[in-house]
């Protein structure tokens, strides 16, 4: 994981490169915090991502896959969509559809937290101004993996 100074510097660089002029300074946190959380979640899930997708797809028609996925992966949360921030970069033209798919793929315990961020409006603004891809690209550069 990056250290505090690296994370702080990263955040200010993102604000300068992506958010300045598009959002007011007091709105930066409405974008930065949720994307930091998303990146951290992705980094925790990353080693088990393919296993999660496979398990979810195998079980979803028969049972609630949540407890089985949690038990088998040892994680308390997961994302069963085919996307994470890194994979979203592979289809820049599909972000309008794929980003909501990514968000809705989180397990219920995380999805409820993400709903409270009310990301729809900032993401809509980023999409409209062709900045969502740039923001996602920036956030995939920072290492927020657990130590």
Regions found by a protein language model. Give the residues of each.
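Non-catalytic, mostly N-terminal accessory regions of nucleic-acid modification and defense proteins
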Residues: 1-147
């Amino acid at each position: 994981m990056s250290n505090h100074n690296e994370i702080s510097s990263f955040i200010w660089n993102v604000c300068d490169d992506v958010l300045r002029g598009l959002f007011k300074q007091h709105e930066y946190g409405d974008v930065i915090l949720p994307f930091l959380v998303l990146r951290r979640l992705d980094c925790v899930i990353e080693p088990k991502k393919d296993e999660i997708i496979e398990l979810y797809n195998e079980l979803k028609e028969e049972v609630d896959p949540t407890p089985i996925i949690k038990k088998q992966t040892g994680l308390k949360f997961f994302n069963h969509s085919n996307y994470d921030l890194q994979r979203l970069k592979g289809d820049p033209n599909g972000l309008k559809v794929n980003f909501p798919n990514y968000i809705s793929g989180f397990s219920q315990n995380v999805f409820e937290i993400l709903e409270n961020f009310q990301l729809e409006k900032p993401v809509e603004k980023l999409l409209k101004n062709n900045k969502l891809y740039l923001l996602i690209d920036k956030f995939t550069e920072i290492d927020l993996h657990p130590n």
